Amino acid sequence: MNLCHVGQNGDYIMNEMFCFQCQQTAHNTGCEGKTGVCGKKADTANYQDELIGALIGLARAAENGNPTEKTDELVLKGLFTTITNVNFNNETIKKLKTEIEKEKGRINSEHFEDYDMTNIWDAHEDVRSLKSLVLFGIKGMAAYAYHSLVLGKTDREVTDFFYKALRLIGEDASPDALLELVMETGKVNFKCMAMLDAANTDAYGDPVPTTVPLTIEKGPFIVVSGHDLHDMKLLLEQTKGKGINIYTHSEMLPAHGYPKLKEYPHLKGNFGTGWQNQQSEFHNIPAPILFTTNCIMPVRQSYCDRVFTTSIVSYPELVHIGDDKDFTPVIEKAIECGGYDEDKEMTGMNGGHIVTTGFAHNAVLSNAEKIVKLVKEGKIKHFFLIGGCDGASPSRSYYTDFAKMTPPDTIILTLACGKYRINDLDLGDIEGIPRILDCGQCNDAYSAVKIALALADAFGCGVNDLPLTLVLSWYEQKAVCILLSLLYLGIKNIYLGPTIPAFVSPGVLNVLVEKFGLTPVDTPEHDLSAIMSAKS
């Protein structure tokens, strides 16, 4: 699987790859050969595997060693680096691995070998599946923990679990023990999402419902993609009074809902649609794009001189903004490019001209009494959560079609970049409650769960007894940790698509179906009929 050979100088010459961590993996079995579907080259994939192997060695060294905050940060950076569409740069991956090797020796005088990841890829399919669920889950969780760390919040239980999970991934373990670890991953990730929610709201206030235009005003502007609200705040501050407008892209859209970010009048609107459309939407764009996290795709010639990276994101030959967060090169490029000569009208994926965001748990639950009343009066019959990661697969039109088919007496919660499939639809409202409520970024699945738990409490029932159905889309590893949290919380009958993950073996899938009622999506008509019949 993870094939390579050693050259005369002792360096690995990486000829072939094996990677199946994202939804678009080739043939829904795994990317092999020289390039993955995401654009990642074989050598990059293998360097990332080596990086994970080094982290497992570091976790072993930390068990009876003396890890510090620096060690903790390296673990988060290492895991985050290997998330899909974060890092395509071999040099930064190798540099990070070298740092990890040095840290291993610093915290423990004993020698700890790096783990060979082919031990996982070549294991029994159920063991491989369960270890993959944990590994990909902690990759996603590391992103949330890193964003929290940047804002000054950490949690010892969360941090310690990364070490525990890495060590157990590198050990022989029974399927039962690994299934228990899978559930623990979901438990700890829920705590991690709560930590990030607190970090974001402490820093920027509780999100408020906000209408966001999709028109790009004439003049210089910067497009900001990714999830890092801290980077957004710093850029807004550095561009204040310079005549440069700021537009969100993809998962940065929820920034518009935070009061402390809304204070900046040059935070104008949202550029484009889902991340998967960036290569066409950024074609000849007269402005720079700043990637703060995933998803960056292979950068095309028509805009490569305008793309900047920061934080964990890295791509060969692009300008990277370092830890000093001096965005001067981005600002200068915006002035140089000049923006559009006239206002440019853009639309959402369904032709809409505005979207809304800011319906996090605080905003929605402030209307809980009204929502409960509407349910009791029969004016709201059902709630759907339609969201998750978006992607390029044509089958993802399922989510748009499903939303369009939902009855007018139902409410749709949405979140993450999967929202772009539906967030510009005009589905009206129910006595002032919009039928589409955008809860935020992928980590704001925490908000959706808090809303569900509060409604269950108000009705005196369990979450699974609510008129609520989760219809989720997945793409990368943050979706994995969210799914594991939902399973840990005992939320059942989740519809998952557009495909079942390649790393979920038939045996493990059978457990998820039997124990949790996990259901692969079929057609919108079939699934909606089944849902409404079951809840009636």
Predicted features and spans:
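Intrinsically disordered, low-complexity, compositionally biased regions/tails
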Residues: 8-11, 141, 209, 230
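Short alpha-helical "patches" and their helix-cap loops
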Residues: 5, 94-99, 153-163, 464-470, ...
